Amino acid sequence: MDIWGLKIFKTVMEEGSISKAAVKLNCVQSNVTARVRQLEEELGVTLFYRKSRGVELTAKGEILINYANDAVQLLDNAFLAVSDDELVGGPLSIGTMESTAAIRLPELFYSYHQKYPVVELSIDTGTTEELVKKVLNHRLDAAFVAGPIDHVSIGQHKAFDEQLVVITERKIKSISNLDRPTFMVFRRGCSYRGVLETWARESGIIPKKIMALGTLEGILGFVNVGMGITLFPKSIVSNLRWENSVSVHPLPKRLGDTSTVLIYRKDRIQTGALKGLIELL
């Protein structure tokens, strides 16, 4: 078992197929297949279920991936520890909530790119729950999520203050007597969806149904025509120019006041690329 074999195994798991892993690793598919089989033979176990549309980890594969993540990260940390601290470059994978990507990150990353033009930046959007898991599993270097995050392995840096509001169609002037509205939200794991559900429960409001959509603009579009209500930072409405299309309604301070934090693993040596991002916050 060597580190390259573990890197191949890790990449196949992340990409969900041997062919996609080969593309990412810039090598031929037969080499990836051979290295996975070699690793399985060496360990005497099957690591992947082979399916028509990709692969899936077996129970033994689920065990090994944790050690593979740690081994690859340990090697990366060793490289960083002896490399030139003045050189700010290389890859930087950042996760973010969709709302943060829309209103907060464009200017931030424009400034970042001006200062660190050779950093290879990649952005992955998802829910807070999904992004926390990806940071913990070494699939992201850091992520912008709704904070604070209470986890022993997570470090965090406050990035933005936000005020959460309920957003309705324009003609609704009060949310005190909403009659079984439809909730227009992201999928489960979205922290703002959780706040909306908490507010509704405490206010005695029972939703008629919950519709999960995949985009911020889609949710606001449905709200605009009266299909339902949603909850997001107030800055969404002004920054995306929805002020004249929807109504915003404040929440009690304990629910409405929140912050977005940049999270990362405490045990990872911070690269110059990540340090540079934190310094801009």
Specify the residue positions occupied by each region the protein language model found:
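Hydrophobic hinge/microswitch elements
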Residues: T127-V132, L136-L140, V145-A146, S191-Y192, ...
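A late-sequence structural motif
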Residues: R104, S247-L281
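Short helix-boundary/capping micro-motifs
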Residues: K10-V28
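Alpha-helical linker/hinge and terminal dimerization helices associated
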Residues: E42-L43, L64-E86
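Secondary-structure junction motif
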Residues: T182-S203, Q270-L274, I278
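Flexible hinge/capping segments at coil-to-helix
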Residues: H151-G189, G194
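A short LG(V/I)-centered, amphipathic sequence patch enriched
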Residues: E40-L57
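Central regulatory/effector-binding core of bacterial HTH transcription factors
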Residues: G89-V152
